[in-house]
Design a protein with these regions (language model features):
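Central cavity-lining transmembrane alpha-helices of secondary-active solute carriers
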Residues: 11-29, 229-241, 320
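Helix-to-loop junctions at the C-terminal end of transmembrane segments
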Residues: 23-36, 123, 238-250, 332
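C-terminal ends and interior cores of transmembrane alpha-helices
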Residues: 45-60, 260-273
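Hydrophobic core of transmembrane alpha-helices in multi-pass small-molecule transporters
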Residues: 63-80, 276-290
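Intracellular juxtamembrane helix-capping segments at the cytosolic ends
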Residues: 79-93, 289-304
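Helix-loop-helix hairpin linking two adjacent transmembrane segments in secondary transporters
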Residues: 94-95, 99-161
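Extracytoplasmic gate region of multi-pass secondary transporters
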Residues: 115, 180-229
Length: 366
């Protein structure tokens, strides 16, 4: 429908991550008022509205309207993340927060793995198709997705769920830490930096993977795209496996191990090149698997009534997915494709620090 330059095409990613930067903290304050369940319902409805707006965007062939619809859709996803992630951790059994959230995130990874080929089959049409056919191929899937999200919102509204705000308030009364601001929790701030580094590193590696597979491993574009699925699919496998591993290993210890291995794989890729670099970088997807849910649960642990605000702050750090890839790309232009991966290696080094020391709750809070 649109004939876009590379810069215009990149506005899609920019709009998506900008929603996290701008809307996460307001979403946290909203959840504080309407509750976690209300936030989940609202997230589904806002996302559905964004999907509906793709209909007029396609009809008018207006890219600005398309970007506006995408921003609204992303805002709904932000609210879902801000409300849903802490909701899961607050309702989980004590000590099982990371494992429970990892299991939930595993289904997210499952959707991420199967959605691209499914979406491509539904949306992409023959190159010789008429404009009307191309417009319809975009409109109908998004209307269907909007209907599905509305159905989910109604389902959540009908299910009787506990008020997690009461659990959070009880946690605050039990701790008696005397803190008057969410920013006084050092482990929360360090956790937000951890999310910034994790999402940035993950997206940077994934975004440049096809270039590595083509220029370093010598694959053609089609094969490179197929191999890329292994990177994202590894996250799905790792999350399902991580759920059970966390029954035996402490969450922070598993996080430290995974981040250390990911960093080591990057170093191996840089010094080796060729197929060794290819398989090393693809394997990182497996070790990325448990990082987001584990960093999130450790960063929001013991915050009580401040949990919703903390969730907003931590989710705003997802903007790292827009900034760190740009930095790594700039280094790739100057020092080379593989050497530029040192940027992602630094991200994983920070995550190791957070997993070993930064996650610890202040003694007054414990």
């Amino acid at each position: 429908i649109f004939n876009l330059s590379y810069t215009q095409a990149m506005l899609v990613q920019f709009c998506f991550f900008t929603a996290y930067a701008l809307m996460s903290i307001p979403a946290g304050k909203l959840v504080e008022k309407i509750g976690y369940k209300g936030g989940v319902i609202g997230g589904f409805l806002i996302a559905a509205f964004g999907c509906i707006l793709f209909y007029p965007a396609a009809s008018s062939a207006s890219y600005p309207i398309f970007l506006g619809a995408l921003f609204i859709l992303a805002t709904g996803i932000v609210l879902l993340q801000v409300a849903g992630n802490p909701y899961v951790t607050l309702l989980a059994k004590p000590g099982k927060e990371s494992a429970t959230l990892t299991l939930i995130q595993a289904f997210n990874s499952l959707a991420t793995t199967i959605a691209p080929p499914l979406g491509a089959a539904m949306i992409f049409v023959d190159a010789n198709a008429s404009l009307a056919e191309r417009i319809s191929s975009v409109q109908m899937p998004y209307l269907g997705l909007a209907g599905f999200m509305i159905l989910l919102a109604v389902t959540v509204a009908m299910i009787k769920l506990p008020d997690a705000r009461q659990i959070a308030q009880a946690e605050t009364e039990h701790n008696h830490d005397g803190k008057t601001s969410v920013w006084q929790y050092k482990h929360m701030v360090l956790g937000a930096v951890g999310i910034f580094c994790y999402v940035g590193g993950e997206v940077a590696i994934g975004s440049m993977m096809v270039n590595v597979l083509e220029k370093v491993a010598g694959l053609d574009h089609e094969k490179a795209a197929n191999y890329l699925a292994l990177y994202w699919g590894g996250a799905m496998v790792g999350r399902f496996a991580g759920t059970f591993i966390m029954d035996k290993v402490k969450a922070n210890q598993l996080l430290a191990f995974n981040a250390s291995v990911a960093g080591a794989l990057i170093v191996l890729a840089i010094v080796s090149g060729g197929k060794v670099a290819m398989w090393s970088l693809l394997a990182i997807g497996l070790f990325n698997s448990i990082m987001f849910p584990t960093i999130f649960s450790l960063g929001t642990h013991g915050l009580g009534k401040y949990t919703s605000q903390a969730s907003g702050i931590i989710c705003s750090a997802i903007v790292g997915g827009a900034l760190i890839p740009v930095a790594q790309g700039a280094f790739a232009d100057t020092i080379g494709l593989l050497p530029a991966y040192f940027v992602s290696a630094i991200c994983y080094a920070y995550i190791v620090f957070f997993a070993l020391k930064g996650y610890k709750v202040d003694e007054k809070t414990a």
